[in-house]
Amino acid sequence: MSNRHKVFVSYHHALDESYMRIFALRFGNAFRAIVPGSVQVGDIDPNLPTETIRQKIRDEYLRDISVTIVLIGALTWQRKHIDWEIGSSIRDTKANPRSGLLGILLPSYHAHHVRVERGRYNPRTIPPRLYDNIKAGFASIHNWSEDPATVQGWIHQAYLRKSSALPDNSRASFGKNRSGDEWND
């Protein structure tokens, strides 16, 4: 089997677009395809039931994705669309099997969270659903790397993990964007 996977990249569009561009340029050839995060404000009615929202994202935006990558910048954890994309990508549906999941800490994460030692992270400053899945052994988190072989290895491991570990999708979905320095349960 090839180690080239179709990946979906979830990121904070307003703050981390430049990193998404760098990521796509640097690593695009290592993957079968990169699908950038594309659920925008107004695309999905937030008043729909949670299951309907997740199903729409899974079937309309994340079709045929092998692995979801979350680019984690300074305020990524606050975004409802990122929460929805993570929750939808780890759902196993008739039309689409669940995706593997991993997070990559961007340089902007450590620039903003100066008290967090490089190579580490504060669990309350990454997307809560991603953290739940790191704890469950379904997801992993890594520091930004410029080495395509390293990143491709992370993606392949996430792809393999999706069959050997169960995701945790028990957290209530964000109803709106959050604010503050960190999340609380």
Annotate each predicted stretch with a short phrase:
Residues 1-67, 95-97, 155, 159, ...:
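Conserved N-terminal substructure of TIR/SEFIR domains
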Residues 10, 70-74, 104-105:
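Conserved beta-strand segments of the P-loop GTPase G domain that flank and frequently precede/overlap
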Residues 14-18, 75-78, 109-111:
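Short acidic, S/G/P-rich loop/turn micro-motifs used as interaction or catalytic elements
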Residues 22-25, 83-86, 116-119:
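Short, glycine/charged-enriched secondary-structure capping and boundary segments
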Residues 75-91:
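Conserved TIR/SEFIR loop-to-helix hotspot centered on a Trp-containing motif
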Residues 91-103:
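Short, acidic/small-residue loops that bind anionic groups at enzyme active sites
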Residues 101-117:
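Short beta-alpha junction loops
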Residues 114-151:
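Acidic, Ser/Thr-rich peripheral helices and adjacent loops at domain boundaries
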